[in-house]
Amino acid sequence: MTQKITLHDMTLRDGMHPKRHLMTLEQMKSVAQGLDAAGVPLIEVTHGDGLGGASVNYGFPAHSDEEYLGTVIPLMKQAKVSALLLPGIGTVDHLKMAHGLGVHTIRVATHCTEADVSEQHITMARKLDMDTVGFLMMAHMNDAAGLVKQARLMEGYGANCIYVTDSAGYLLPDQVTERIAAVRAALKPETELGFHCHHNLAMGVANSIAAIQAGANRIDAAAAGLGAGAGNTPLEVLVAVLDRMGIDTGVDVWKIQDVAEDLVVPLMDFPIRIDRDALTLGYAGVYGSFLLFAKRAEKKYGIPARDLLVELGRRGMVGGQEDMIEDTALTMARARGLTVNA
């Protein structure tokens, strides 16, 4: 088993989803400084949908990516800052902006069958000498052999780390083991391997341990689990478990608990928990950030969010198709004879 694991905090990026991207600069500063002091080595900061995510489709943030990054990066004493970039949302210009502000790690994210769209962004990030990560989302929608092909593409473009990403919180530990082990065996020994998951089936910690045992050395988590759906793997819990297992993370067991309890929980707009809708995300294999969109559509069209999420899963909807949630709700409402106000 790998004895040194890099933990990557998601509180200030994935945690933007339940905050509707409206975190204040003061909240960002407070949490980032707490994470830094607790020894977290890598902290992601951006709009929930990555660089350039500010839009009608995904939601407008309280501040620009430049403001968030420009506020947090100068305050870090040991932690590095990462940014997420989804080709088609974020551009090479966004990438250059992030690099100019001092972003250390760029994570270029695509659907798990579409690694080919990442070539331009990964190639540019490597030219800029950034820590360059290929991030394969919705990994339950591709089998181990398929993920291997996609991972090799990203590695070939220049990514020095590949992530298997359970965006829906759908995978079970044996499925994580199968995918991670296959990708690990296929990559160059020097290429790092990461795992990101959601806690929709309460599998966050178990799946992260399975990933580590199968060869992953970077693991995503969030303080108090703040993230889309039922949240990400709770960082403070994962740190405690890894400490008991004798795995070095460099994160202080007690300080990270205090960050979660004293800084992150108070800024939650609602409890991050496995309610029936978040559970349905995991059960039906639906992209985590769809949750609030489905709840809004329930209020507008009278279709229970759970029913809508199941239908989205049946249709195989993926990240980036947020605009189709409303369309699906409208179709379902009409099919059920519900009155829809235009």
Curated annotation (Swiss-Prot):
Any matching Pfam family: HMGL-like
Annotated positions binding substrate: R13, D14, S167, H196, Y287
GO biological process, one term: catabolic process
SUPFAM superfamilies in the record: Aldolase, post-HMGL domain-like
Record field: catalytic activity: (S)-4-hydroxy-2-oxopentanoate = acetaldehyde + pyruvate
Active-site residues annotated for this sequence: H17
Domain Pyruvate carboxyltransferase: start-end pairs: 5-257
Key words of the record: Aromatic hydrocarbons catabolism, Lyase, Manganese, Metal-binding
Annotated positions for site Transition state stabilizer: R13
One MF term in the entry's GO annotations: manganese ion binding
EC category name: lyase
Entry-linked CDD domains: DRE_TIM_HOA
EC number from the UniProt entry: 4.1.3.39
Positions annotated to bind Mn(2+): D14, H196, H198
Source domain of life: Bacteria
Family, as annotated: Belongs to the 4-hydroxy-2-oxovalerate aldolase family.
Protein name (record): 4-hydroxy-2-oxovalerate aldolase
